[in-house]
Curated annotation (Swiss-Prot):
Region (Disordered) residue spans: 1-25
GO cellular component: cytosolic large ribosomal subunit
InterPro entries referenced in this protein's UniProt entry, alphabetically: Ribosomal_uL22, Ribosomal_uL22_CS, Ribosomal_uL22_euk/arc, Ribosomal_uL22_sf
Membrane-spanning ranges: none
Organism: Methanosarcina barkeri (strain Fusaro / DSM 804)
Family assignment from sequence similarity: Belongs to the universal ribosomal protein uL22 family.
GO BP term, pick one: cytoplasmic translation
Role according to the record: This protein binds specifically to 23S rRNA. It makes multiple contacts with different domains of the 23S rRNA in the assembled 50S subunit and ribosome.
HAMAP family: Ribosomal_uL22_A
UniProt subunit comment: Part of the 50S ribosomal subunit.
Gene name linked to the record: rpl22
Protein name: Large ribosomal subunit protein uL22
Length: 151
């Protein structure tokens, strides 16, 4: 596996970082979730992700929204990406524990950077009738998150 670096440089004394590598979730859905939580305070983002997992709060889809219906609130199309939200919540909790280890207060921090990059594609084949096969590929995602103190 290749070494993955963070795409932005931040001050190490006032920030906390966490990363998830080659997660088996949809890149499109994880992009929409990361766009929504970027700029939120940490407790607010944690509550939002927990509500998405419980199907109480929808994530607005700006780019990949064909066939999505309108949802309550200030959004047009929205969905409930549960598996992507679970993985991003794990990364957020990891960044919170990294902040506590550094002596920072996670309740007073906000998400300055939440980005995804597509990871490698895991090739697979599903056998079909008469000796044929259909490709069944699994996409992976690399997610990076940086928390900063509120100034």
């Amino acid at each position: 596996m290749a070494r993955i670096n963070y795409s932005v440089k931040e001050d190490p004394e006032t920030t906390s970082k966490a990363m998830g590598s080659e997660l088996h979730i949809s890149p499109k859905k994880s992009r929409e979730v990361c766009c929504k939580i970027k700029g939120m305070k940490v407790p607010e983002a944690r509550k939002f992700l927990e509500d998405v997992i419980a199907l109480k709060q929808a994530v607005p889809f700006k780019r990949h929204h064909d066939g999505s219906g309108h949802r309550k609130g200030p959004m047009a199309a929205g969905r409930y990406p549960v598996s992507a939200s679970k993985e991003i919540l794990k990364i957020l909790r990891n960044a919170e524990s990294n902040a506590e280890y550094k002596g920072l207060e996670p309740a007073n921090m906000y998400i300055t950077h939440a980005a995804i990059q597509r990871g490698r594609v895991i090739r697979g084949f599903m056998p079909r009738a008469r000796g044929r096969a259909t490709p069944k590929d699994t996409e992976t995602v690399n997610i990076e998150m940086i928390l900063s103190e509120v100034r």
